[in-house]
Amino acid sequence: MAQSEVNSVCVASDRAGDTGDQSDDSSDGSLFKTQCAPSPIQKQRHPTVKRVTLPASVETDSSSDSSIEPRPLTLKAIFERFKKKKRKKRKKRKYEPKLRPRGRPRGKPSGTRITRRSQIDAKQIKDKGAVFPFLESESGRKPLPWKKILTYEQAVARGFFHHIEKLKYEHHLKECLKQMHAGEDLEKEDLDSRRHKYMDDDGSLSPIEEPLTEDEATNPQAECDIKLVEDSCFIISSEFSRKRNLEQEKIKKESTFSKKAKDATHREKGHRRTLKGNEHVTIEEDSRPQPRPFAHLQSKVMKKGELEYLEVHHLCGLSQPL
């Protein structure tokens, strides 16, 4: 292919050279004839064929894929491959300012303040919903505040749902009585009385009376658990607590008197109690009066002989001179 393309290019260049020579001859022969400008030669663009040269290692690998067994992946190989990978840098996002207004809105005076009351229409203020005339007379205010109206509306809704629940129980009980073929006189009673009659802690009780056995007929009060008792059995008398308080006060007084008597006896004997660790230890004291220190300084101005006499007596342990 390449040789044929080169040959065609050579032929085209020869033809162009011949035409150029002929034009030169004609121009030399006839000077007065108008000369035609030669048209530019259009060179053929050679299509570049890109050959992808595969490395020898790839060719050998492709040929020897069937012979070589696949290597088992290990953690070390996975980590090395992850480290060699070039991580793409994230593009830094430019700050795009939001179109929210900042600061105080313009066109409004600084003193004005938007309140919730200003947003409520006049019709909403007039029509407060449910009216409670008996509550208005008790509270003394004709237009009740919003908080009270909300609490009363909630109470009304609660009572309504309780009434629906009661009606549902009644309807269910009537259906059960019809299935049990109970009398019509039982259906005429109120729900509360029927509830206590047919329900018990252990389970549901049948409204149909069961026939009594022979033992129950002979001894009707044998298995009776209910007994009428006076009210005094249930009320605890307060005399017991008073007596108990008086006894406690007496015991306290006796203990205080005994402590005082012991302290007085210890003082008379001249004993003194001291703490030795965590135990009280009694120490006997001398009943004799101890000499006062510096007694000679308290006396008035004396003669030298009297002072010497007092000092001698003081050193001997005598409080007063003989």
UniProtKB/Swiss-Prot annotation:
Disulfide bonds, paired cysteine numbers: none
Protein name as catalogued: TATA box-binding protein-associated factor RNA polymerase I subunit D
Phosphoserine sites (modified residues): 23, 137, 232
Keywords: DNA-binding, Nucleus, Phosphoprotein, Transcription, Transcription regulation
Positions of the UniProt region annotated as Disordered: 1-70, 82-116, 198-219, 257-276
Residues passing through the membrane, by range: none
Any GO MF annotation of the entry: DNA binding
Extent of Basic and acidic residues compositional bias: 257-267
Example GO biological process: regulation of DNA-templated transcription
Compositionally biased region (Basic residues): 82-107
GO cellular component, one term: nucleoplasm
Function field: Component of the transcription factor SL1/TIF-IB complex, which is involved in the assembly of the PIC (preinitiation complex) during RNA polymerase I-dependent transcription. The rate of PIC formation probably is primarily dependent on the rate of association of SL1/TIF-IB with the rDNA promoter. SL1/TIF-IB is involved in stabilization of nucleolar transcription factor 1/UBTF on rDNA. Formation of SL1/TIF-IB excludes the association of TBP with TFIID subunits.
Cited Pfam families: TAF1D (PF15333)
Localization per Swiss-Prot or TrEMBL: Nucleus
Organism: Mus musculus
